[in-house]
Amino acid sequence: MRTEKEILNLVSEFAYQRSNVKIIALEGSRTNENIKKDKFQDYDFAFFVSDIEYFTHEESWLSLFGELLFIQKPEDMELFPPDLDYGYSYIMYFKDGIKMDITLINLKDLNRYFSDSDGLVKILVDKDNLVTQEIVPDDSNYWLKKPTEREFYDCCNEFWSVSTYVAKGVFRREILFALDHFNNILRPELLRMISWYIGFNRGFDFSLGKNYKFINKYLTDKEFNMLLATFEMNGYRKTYQSFKLCCELFKYYSNKVSCLGNYNYPNYEKNIENFIRNNYEN
């Protein structure tokens, strides 16, 4: 696998050899000094060019970055509408294990790009000194955010409201219905509550990473193993056990956050647990 230095040099040389490539920015985790580097991090680049169609019309230039195994063009897909409403992107996997994303952006959209940026940007090439402001990579947009009392209430309300759907799905033997609500709504609210608990104890000036991937660093082994146990969903019995554990964990962490944040505690669980017990457990 090529090194980071080799990839950055390759991309920079590409820009300097082409008059219509004016600026290249590196984005994402490779700009974030708060994340430990490893060789599997993606390379996310923004190429600011004078003519996007020049590059999209004939795409042999992509092979200059290595031997391609797979490519996706989000702006050229029908089933999955692209997130970006300006520019054109390539998601590429290379034979040596490198994953590289290149987004072509018209030079006229430079200010819009910085306005929309998440802060994790580093300028690699600026041939004409067009970037006038100082650009320093910053991950503060992803830091934990202290909840308002209303946000705390809303999280509790959503969790207990959706818990009834999981219980009903298991009772009806509609496992995919139950799992969808469990995985996509219920557990994310548990993770949100745990993240607030961590924030109140450790501060709100850092990130837990995408999909809470660093959350284990801020929990005890016992706490993290209990969280992992909510993912054991092999069949109805196991799913319901995990669901009940999820509810117990949510009660534990929401009570902690209520105390730490000096919030009134909305005692939703008593009525909802009675509702579930009376309707889906008899």
Curated annotation (Swiss-Prot):
It catalyses: streptomycin + ATP = 6-O-adenylylstreptomycin + diphosphate. Required for streptomycin resistance. Adenylates streptomycin on the O-6 residue. Pfam families: Adenyl_transf. Its EC number is 2.7.7.-. Keywords: Antibiotic resistance, Plasmid, Transferase. The keyword Cell membrane does not apply. This is Aminoglycoside 6-adenylyltransferase. It comes from Staphylococcus aureus. One of its GO terms (biological process) is response to antibiotic. One of its GO terms (molecular function) is transferase activity. The keyword Transmembrane does not apply. Disulfide bonds: none annotated.
